Regions:
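Conserved N-terminal alpha-helix of the aminotransferase class I/II PLP-enzyme fold
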Residues: 118, 163-188
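Hard-cation-handling environments
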Residues: 11, 35, 45, 66, ...
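Flexible inter-domain linker/hinge segments
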Residues: 68-142, 146-154, 159-162
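Noncatalytic alpha-helical scaffolds and linker/capping helices
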Residues: 42-45, 53-80
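Gly-rich Lys/Arg/Thr-decorated short loops/hinges at beta-loop-alpha junctions or inter-strand turns
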Residues: 19-24, 102-103, 160-174
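Buried hydrophobic positions in well-ordered alpha/beta secondary-structure cores of metabolic enzymes
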Residues: 1, 28, 60, 144, ...
Length: 188
């Protein structure tokens, strides 16, 4: 994710676009001045949801579903300049400033990370922790939460569907009509 965001940042910078956040993981903020609204509308029309930030600025979030083709298309939509993503990828790999942010101290030093040397040993340890946990499927809460206890697991399956759970965080209201209808019905 970060690599694609870094490629996007480099491509935009080379095309003359100001990237305002120096440090980032997956989200860029760009300053387009008076062009921000027209670029926002063009990206919306192309199927990309950007965030309208401060006056003249847009936010771009890169996630697991973003591809190299998306990066090229976004740079072209925003700047009008076509880029070679592979060339930028090589440049970003060689000049990654995030290397300075990598952890250098000792990690996983707690004894639990060093005392289980087999898969079955680790599974036994995890099962022991699980058995200590108090959960609704192993106990009963005497007061309240009746609805929660009675909901069948199958009723919860839709929550895992992409159509339900993959709403883009910057999606405009016209793309969230189903969510708005569902929320309205829950308030009645």
């Amino acid at each position: 994710i970060h690599r694609l965001a870094a490629i996007l940042a480099e491509g935009l910078k080379r095309a003359g676009v100001t990237v305002t956040n120096r440090s980032f993981f997956d989200t860029l903020r760009i300053d387009l001045g008076a062009r921000a609204l027209s670029v926002y509308q063009a990206t919306q029309a192309a199927g990309y949801n950007l965030r309208q930030a401060a006056s003249g600025e847009l936010g771009i979030a890169v996630d697991e579903k973003t591809t190299a083709d998306d990066i090229g298309a976004l740079v072209k939509l925003i700047s009008g300049v076509a880029i070679d993503v592979a060339t930028l990828d090589a440049h970003v790999a060689a000049n990654d400033p995030a290397a300075a942010l990598l952890r250098t101290d000792a990690i996983l030093t707690h004894p639990v990370f060093n005392c289980h040397h087999t898969e079955h040993g680790m599974l036994r340890y995890l099962k022991k922790l699980q058995n200590r946990d108090l959960a609704l499927d192993h106990s009963m809460i005497s007061l309240g939460s009746c609805t929660m206890k009675l909901n069948a697991t199958s009723e919860m399956i839709p929550v895992t569907w992409a159509e339900f759970g993959d709403m883009h965080p910057f999606a405009p209201l016209d793309q969230a009509q189903g969510y708005l209808e569902m929320i309205e019905s829950l308030t009645e």
